[in-house]
Regions:
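C-terminal helical/coil "lid" or tail adjacent to the Rossmann-like core of SAM-dependent
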Residues: 10, 14-17, 28, 198-254
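Conserved alpha-helix/loop element of class I SAM-dependent methyltransferases that forms part
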Residues: 26-43
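Class I SAM-dependent methyltransferase SAM/SAH-binding core
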Residues: 48, 52-98
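A short acidic, Gly/Pro-enriched loop at the edge of an enzyme's catalytic core
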Residues: 97-107
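A short SAM/SAH-binding and catalytic strip from SAM-dependent methyltransferases
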Residues: 105-120
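A short glycine-rich, Lys/Arg-flanked "PGG" loop and its adjoining helix->strand segment in the class I
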Residues: 120-135
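Conserved catalytic/acceptor-binding region of the Class I
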Residues: 137-212
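Core SAM-dependent methyltransferase catalytic element
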Residues: 194, 258-269
Length: 269
């Protein structure tokens, strides 16, 4: 996940981004790690982690590739990347050429392309940077306009307020240039139409309970998105109440399904 952008990236704030990256790693890393293990990252692999964030997946790629491997971890803001042994590079995947060290056997990006209006051009760039037989792994969350289903709550009013909040977040993302449904609707087809084979998607979803990692993310979003939420009719009292709702262990909801779409560059001459 990239942590800075010249576009209207919706999530911002230094303290909030640190907390957000930590919570996202807790929520999403197990599924990403499982996906990469299933692909069979070979020893000595050359890997590129796009939008490396805090560096957790770069560290995982380093472990899979082993001592003879190479991992390049890029982001617009590299200050948070903690991946000893990786080559860390400030890089804008929209405009900068692919980093040195390729062609790559594995390229991974999570929660990056959905935020970029130039996502299809970036996808083509990533495909071009693959070695023959190399894998591209793009992970996005399936974010629908209906928001997140609530499973348990202490009151119908809490369900209504959280539903209004989660639907507003989707609209705020879209207004900032993101395509919240890219991962579920268009990504698989876009990869299949490129020079990739064995394209397949894996969907994973989990519930979260008040006070856990999912709760932390929603609490962070009430702070990061306070201005656009207030512009959509939320009051300070609403946002304070939301922070209490998502911290309540009696509250639980589904998380956005993580869609991992993988494709391999043809090895034919």
């Amino acid at each position: 996940m990239s942590t800075a952008s010249e576009t209207q990236y919706a999530f911002h704030g230094a303290v909030e981004v640190d907390d957000q990256l930590d919570a996202l790693e807790t929520m999403l890393d197990p599924g990403t790690a499982e996906c990469l293990v299933r692909l069979g990252v070979p020893a000595g692999a050359r890997c590129w982690e796009v939008g490396a964030g805090g560096g957790s997946i770069a560290r995982h790629l380093l472990a899979l590739a082993g001592p003879g491997g190479r991992v390049v971890a890029t982001d617009l803001d590299t200050s948070r990347i903690a991946a000893p042994g990786a080559e860390i590079l400030q890089h804008d995947v929209r405009w900068d050429p692919a980093p040195d060290g390729g062609p790559f056997d594995v390229i991974h990006a999570r929660w990056v392309l959905m935020h970029l209006p130039e996502r299809r051009r970036v996808l083509s760039k990533l495909v071009d940077a693959l070695a023959p037989g190399g894998w591209l792994v793009i992970e996005e969350s399936m974010v629908t306009p209906e928001g997140l289903p609530v499973l348990t709550s202490s009151s119908p009013a809490d369900v209504e307020l959280f539903g209004r909040f989660s639907r507003a977040v989707v609209r705020i993302l879209a207004d900032a240039g993101a395509d919240p449904q890219w991962g579920a609707r268009d990504l698989h087809a876009a990869m299949a139409e490129s020079s990739l084979e064995d394209v397949h998607s894996i969907h994973r979803t989990d519930s979260w309970t008040g006070g856990g990692a999912g709760s932390r993310l929603h609490d962070i979003h009430t702070r990061q998105l306070r201005e656009p939420l207030c512009a959509r009719g939320f009051t300070d009292s609403d946002l304070d109440r939301l922070q209490n709702i998502v911290a309540d262990p009696r509250f639980s909801a589904m998380w956005y399904p993580l869609v991992s779409t993988c494709g391999r560059k043809t090895s034919r001459a």
